[in-house]
Amino acid sequence: MGIKYLPVSVASTALSFVGLQVWTELSLDRLRADGLIAKNISLGDSEHALELLLGSYFTIALLTNFVLNVYILLVLSLKTLFFGDLYDVETKKLVERLANYIIYKGTFLPLVIPPTIFQGVLWTVWLTVLCTLKMFQALARDRLERLNASPSSTPWTYFRVYSVLFLVLSVDMFWIKLSLMTYNTIGSAVYLLLLFEPCSIAFETLQALLIHGFQLLDMWINHLAVKNSDCQRSKFIDSMTAGSLLEWKGLLNRNLGFFLDMATLVMALGHYLHIWWLHGIAFHLVDAVLFLNIRALLSAILKRIKGYIKLRIALGALHAALPDATSEELRAYDDECAICREPMAKAKRLHCNHLFHLGCLRSWLDQGLNEVYSCPTCRKPLFVGRTENEVNPRTVEVSSDEQLARQLERQNNPVHALATGLFPAEVPDSVENDTSRNLGLDPSWLQTWSSQGSDVAGPSTTSRTVGLGRVQMMMRHLASVGESYAQTALDDAAWSLWPMNPSQASTSSTTVPPGNGGRTGGLHLRTVSNTTNESLTNILAMAETVREVMPHVPDEIIFQDLQRTNSVAVTVNNLLQM
């Protein structure tokens, strides 16, 4: 599908048009010679002449060939205009996705469609249009992701690819209108199937427009600031937009993205439910496949809802842990964020009265080592007046961690492998019986803001007994999940019969670098003493961090996931989807 195919497509389309025209003239001359039509065809005789022409299979073949060539020419022209040459990875992914879509969406249509020529042509055109829309949507999303990661991309290049999403949405809305008119005209329940997939594509396209629209806006603002650095109007625009762009981006991506994500899943579920209702239950193999697909979609919907609820709880905890700066403070300081050097429409205030964007502060705390978190400006500790036990309330569990380390070491030694499991059975009653663990929050979090509510920020001089590890890890999780939640929700699941397991989607997109001591890939603990001790130390430290954020998750599940992923962020992502 490279640019070199475009001249070939133009020549093929021209030849097919000439061949169709020549054959039509010869057919009309033969019909005139037989006396079936008059020499001068009037408007009233045109319908009869067209019926006679379409009575020939060769005419239908030439017409089909011409339409197919026009379609290929149109696709290649749009591809050349918006994308240029495709990368090898894009071409490979495109072929795989289209094959999956045709198999999983077109296979079930013969079960409910009457075997007539009209029905065959109608549903073939329907599937072709949907495949084309999905193809351009997927190409646009993949290319936008590549441009977003490229430092040399310009706003114009980004907008050229971004406009493909508007084209897809416009054609899809027009197709939905035609499908609705067809259903209203014929009135058969079969034609409701014309609506589910176009609506699903519309929701997916709106989701992509939302996510990449913020990226385009951010790129345009940065480009404008660099180009017109001395222009007062540019500075005014920056002060009005840059400060609140991050807040609006996270809010809309999280809430509106979740709604569009759920709408896409519901449309896919409705498509298969309607096919099952039209086909009936006959206890055949196809019924089992439909049932498994419906079950997987229902499971994905429930997991998405549970993940969104957990994310909302985490956001409330984070906003309570770090108080918001008031409008009076923002006007009094009239400062910009010391991390991103952008104006602040909303900010979080530390106890030292320095203000920062929540996202910037989240990234700063993500760099903290050994729970030594300081203000980016004055380097004062973020939370003062706290004892060592308050900073790390789980240090009393060192004995259990030592037991875990010893059992992990035995497990990695084939001579001392344990058949009964990896983790100790002894768990403190105070941890297991704490009801607040069922909510995913530690009691030390709840005690400090239960009387204020999650959105009320205390004074800057008030010290809060908030676990720094929990704040840091919660910020890391919200950075990796909250902002990209809507974007990665249906990237590959919408193409397959069964949606991808969220844990598989997370781990498959994460590359774990080789560790020290010859470890490659995932976490493989060796029997060598130095490597084993280092690996045990790392996994215990990561388990402690995950345990601070999600104390309600059993230790066994945390350690098993960490051994598979060797990443705290990926493990938190996986546990949130449970």
UniProtKB/Swiss-Prot annotation:
<feature type="transmembrane region" description="Helical">
    <location>
        <begin position="186"/>
        <end position="206"/>
    </location>
</feature>
<comment type="function">
    <text>E3 ubiquitin protein ligase that acts as a positive regulator of RPM1- and RPS2-dependent hypersensitive response (HR), in association with RIN3. Probably not required for RPM1 degradation during HR.</text>
</comment>
<feature type="region of interest" description="Disordered">
    <location>
        <begin position="504"/>
        <end position="524"/>
    </location>
</feature>
<feature type="transmembrane region" description="Helical">
    <location>
        <begin position="58"/>
        <end position="78"/>
    </location>
</feature>
<keyword id="KW-0381">Hypersensitive response</keyword>
<dbReference type="InterPro" id="IPR003892">
    <property type="entry name" value="CUE"/>
</dbReference>
<comment type="subunit">
    <text>Interacts (via C-terminus) with RPM1 (via N-terminus).</text>
</comment>
<dbReference type="GO" id="GO:0016567">
    <property type="term" value="P:protein ubiquitination"/>
</dbReference>
<feature type="transmembrane region" description="Helical">
    <location>
        <begin position="6"/>
        <end position="26"/>
    </location>
</feature>
<keyword id="KW-0862">Zinc</keyword>
<dbReference type="GO" id="GO:0008270">
    <property type="term" value="F:zinc ion binding"/>
</dbReference>
<feature type="transmembrane region" description="Helical">
    <location>
        <begin position="272"/>
        <end position="292"/>
    </location>
</feature>
<feature type="transmembrane region" description="Helical">
    <location>
        <begin position="161"/>
        <end position="181"/>
    </location>
</feature>
<feature type="domain" description="CUE">
    <location>
        <begin position="538"/>
        <end position="578"/>
    </location>
</feature>
<dbReference type="GO" id="GO:0009626">
    <property type="term" value="P:plant-type hypersensitive response"/>
</dbReference>
<dbReference type="GO" id="GO:0004842">
    <property type="term" value="F:ubiquitin-protein transferase activity"/>
</dbReference>
<protein>
    <recommendedName>
        <fullName>E3 ubiquitin protein ligase RIN2</fullName>
        <ecNumber>2.3.2.27</ecNumber>
    </recommendedName>
</protein>
<keyword id="KW-0808">Transferase</keyword>
<keyword id="KW-0479">Metal-binding</keyword>
<dbReference type="GO" id="GO:0034052">
    <property type="term" value="P:positive regulation of plant-type hypersensitive response"/>
</dbReference>
<dbReference type="GO" id="GO:0005886">
    <property type="term" value="C:plasma membrane"/>
</dbReference>
<dbReference type="Pfam" id="PF13639">
    <property type="entry name" value="zf-RING_2"/>
</dbReference>
<keyword id="KW-1133">Transmembrane helix</keyword>
<feature type="transmembrane region" description="Helical">
    <location>
        <begin position="111"/>
        <end position="131"/>
    </location>
</feature>
<dbReference type="Pfam" id="PF02845">
    <property type="entry name" value="CUE"/>
</dbReference>
<dbReference type="GO" id="GO:0043130">
    <property type="term" value="F:ubiquitin binding"/>
</dbReference>
<dbReference type="InterPro" id="IPR035667">
    <property type="entry name" value="RIN3_plant_CUE"/>
</dbReference>
<keyword id="KW-0472">Membrane</keyword>
<feature type="zinc finger region" description="RING-type; atypical">
    <location>
        <begin position="337"/>
        <end position="379"/>
    </location>
</feature>
<keyword id="KW-0863">Zinc-finger</keyword>
<keyword id="KW-0812">Transmembrane</keyword>
<keyword id="KW-0833">Ubl conjugation pathway</keyword>
<feature type="compositionally biased region" description="Polar residues">
    <location>
        <begin position="504"/>
        <end position="513"/>
    </location>
</feature>
<dbReference type="InterPro" id="IPR001841">
    <property type="entry name" value="Znf_RING"/>
</dbReference>
<keyword id="KW-0611">Plant defense</keyword>
<dbReference type="InterPro" id="IPR013083">
    <property type="entry name" value="Znf_RING/FYVE/PHD"/>
</dbReference>
<comment type="pathway">
    <text>Protein modification; protein ubiquitination.</text>
</comment>
